[in-house]
Amino acid sequence: MDSHAGNTADPRGSRRGVGLQGSGSPRARQLLERLDARPLAARAAADLSALVRKAGATLRLRHKEAISGLDSADIEVADSRLPHATLVEHRPQHQRSDTQGPRMEPLPVIQNKASYASRLPQATGRFSVELVRGPAGFGLTLSGGRNVSGNVPLAVCGLLKDGPAQRCGHLQAGDLVLYINGQSTRGLTHAQAVEWIRTGGPRLCLVLQRPQEMNGSRSKEVGGGHQKTDRIPDPRGGRMMESRGTISPVHHRPKTRTGPGPSPESVATGHVVRAAEHPAEDLEDRIPGSPGPWLVPSEDRLSRALGIRGGGVQLAQEMAAGRRRH
């Protein structure tokens, strides 16, 4: 509505309507709820202009503040005032945006604080507990703190039965106390921590961390390392060996003789070399790239080829005698 509606006379011929006296009379830039018993919500300016033109010389307006008090006002508008009726639709939109603006601004701030509080325990592995002092205190005992021997982490020692700490359902014995009412417990003595709790008021806010969450990943890594250094069976026999301390069996090649004659030590002791040659041939067969057993003749074949009778003992004696001659 325009401010001309509040004047007693208008130069363009409009006259003041009935019922404008008193506190219930409409004011300029006032939110309008209904126009001729029709709600104005979600109506465009063209629709409002059409309603004003169809209303004739009398409009019945109901402002928004009068809904609760069931109050209304009658205003007579001449045809010359019809172009000014378009202000009715523009003013409530501007006023509504102004009134709802301050209400919507604090909401993102509150949501950011709530989301940060919910993300804090997940991101750092910590959790917070707020306790209210009961008749017997907060119902928990502490252990640790800085002393003469060293700095022991401050932790929850025990929970009083049916106390506030036990009823909250989050605390356990052994939880590390990191903060007391927003203050870090690093470097605190046991007496100082107890004094902070006593003088902190009826509410106690603790930030804690469970030891299993800190050492869980470390224990898994150590356990996996032991499994890697476990002993494995030797493929050459029932003997066990460690993978880090021993060399692969491929590098352990047995030393075998390729010559046809026995060593001087075997001749001196009188041992027959035939029994030692067969395992040597078997080992040479297993190693790829080594010469076959046909290149290393046995003593029987060699003695038969040379026409020597008496077997390997006589052959060994003759070969030893030949070496002495040379």
Curated annotation (Swiss-Prot):
Pfam families per UniProt: PDZ
Coiled-coil blocks: none
Residue positions, PTM Phosphoserine: 263
Origin superkingdom: Eukaryota
Domain PDZ intervals: 128-212
Keyword field contains Magnesium: no
SMART domains, per the entry: PDZ
Residues spanning the signal sequence: none
Region (Disordered): 1-32, 214-267
Compositional bias (Basic and acidic residues): 218-242
Record bears the keyword Phosphoprotein: yes
S-S bonds: none
Keywords in alphabetical order: Phosphoprotein
The protein's name in its UniProt record: PDZ domain-containing protein MAGIX
Source organism of this protein record: Rattus norvegicus
Lineage: Eukaryota, Metazoa, Chordata, Craniata, Vertebrata
Encoding gene, per UniProt annotation: Magix
